[in-house]
């Protein structure tokens, strides 16, 4: 059964709530961050999170932690099945947890530690969050050998759009596209300074 409940208004340091989170995204108390051999120690914490998800009927075995300034600020285990949320991968849950704790969606200078190489969605989430460093243990081939499709997704995304087979991608031209572009342009025009094209 999917978990439901009212959204939570987290209050960031210094003031006003910025993000709305749902209860299932709140993780357990943060573990102690050791001072020596950070990468290995933080990876072990990520793997410990993955062990929380060993029930094959309700979980998928992945875990992650986010570290900023040498401290763990976000933890996550895979919650896709229990939350009925296809985006609730361990890395995304950890990023959400970090954002809630810090009161910001930008985690610049942070490191994400994952028990396994992130899927394309989670890798992109790291980009959006401004994560500076990604450290993982098992890789996409290890995941594939144990029944997880990450490698297939990476191969699919490497193909030109017209050659992809996992879903149909349709870019509609004409008036509909123009209407959508107008919204993008209106947002850019409303920004306080010039918007730099990301081409």
Language-model regions, residue ranges each:
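Short, flexible loop/turn motifs enriched in small residues
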Residues: 57-61
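Short beta-strand scaffold segments in enzyme catalytic cores
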Residues: 62-67
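A short, polar/charged loop-to-alpha-helix boundary motif
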Residues: 80-93, 97
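Local cysteine-cluster metal-coordination motifs and their immediate loop/turn environment
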Residues: 115-132
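Immediate flanking context of iron-sulfur cluster ligation sites
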Residues: 104-117
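Short beta->alpha transition motifs characteristic of CBS
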Residues: 74-80
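Zinc-dependent deaminase
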Residues: 2, 9-55, 127-199
